[in-house]
Regions:
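Short Cys/His-rich metal-coordination motifs, predominantly Zn2+-binding knuckles/fingers
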Residues: 23
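Short metal-coordination and nucleic-acid-contact micro-motifs, chiefly zinc-binding Cys/His arrays
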Residues: 12-18
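Extended alpha-helical scaffolding segments
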Residues: 1-7, 27-252
């Protein structure tokens, strides 16, 4: 790898360089950036410039580089890191990709956060489930204590969602950065105030897609189903309620 990197730098040594607006360094500036960050949207790009027709930005910029310049090395590092995170730690809700990660390397935070309080299935052996709200909150407190041991309070947490409105453009539809302590406190606040009786499985906090199904779903063959377009938009609204402690939308 080191030999290839050295060879690549040699090829770039004679190329014209400019200021990378992300790293702040002088780098070889690239116009074309990687696609396929989200596998299902294989042709969609996060960074692209195409103004050969309709002239959306003419009169503001003459060249794409006047709006943004990104270095080749920075672009490769950022896109490949993001592609790995999405491939390994994302969940898909209604066709939209949601991902949560710790820049220090803790894995699968988003998936685990959905089970901060255990959810039980019919296949599991019969056990003692939280039979009352008091039992439920006691279980939640134990789970939160375990999470606090895993995730230092000062660690950073990043939550984002991605969706492609067209085949060529990938959008960041939600983005938030917060400390580990805030992240856990907000999850705990949501689960402490938003729970219901699950019959023989006791009291549990429903997932955001379960809430969307109950609010907007139509019954088909004994099951609730929701159009993907409705699911992804409403799930993101509820994610805002969970992570940002915003009020639950009145229509839900």
């Amino acid at each position: 790898f080191d030999a290839f990197i050295g060879y690549h730098h040699t090829l770039q040594s004679t190329a014209q360089k400019g200021l990378c607006m992300i790293s702040g360094n002088e780098e070889l500036i690239v116009k074309n950036h990687p696609c396929g960050i989200v596998a299902k949207d294989g042709r969609a790009k996060l960074i692209s410039a195409n103004d050969k027709s309709n002239f959306t930005y003419r009169g503001r910029f003459i060249e794409p580089q006047q709006a943004l310049t990104v270095g080749h090395e920075t672009s490769q590092k950022a896109h490949n890191a993001l592609a790995w995170i999405i491939a390994n730690q994302s969940i898909m809700i209604g066709g939209r990709t949601f991902v949560c990660w710790n820049p220090k390397g803790d894995t699968s935070l988003f998936k685990d956060s959905e089970t901060l309080t255990p959810n039980y299935s019919d296949e599991e052996e019969k056990k003692d489930f939280p039979a009352t709200p008091t039992d439920y909150k006691a279980d939640l407190k134990k789970a939160l204590s375990g999470w606090q041991d895993k995730l230092p309070a000062e660690d950073d947490i990043v939550i984002a969602s991605f969706d492609a409105a067209t085949t060529g453009r990938l959008s960041i539809t939600y983005y938030n950065e917060l400390k580990g302590s805030d992240f856990l406190n907000r999850l705990a606040f949501w689960k402490e105030h938003c729970y219901w009786s699950s019959g023989k499985f006791g009291y549990q906090s429903p997932s955001i897609w379960e809430i969307v199904k109950c609010a907007f779903g139509t019954e088909q063959n004994g099951k609730l189903s929701v159009d993907d377009r409705v699911m992804r938009e409403q799930a993101q609204r509820l994610l805002h309620s969970v992570i940002d402690q915003a009020p639950i939308p009145q229509d839900i």
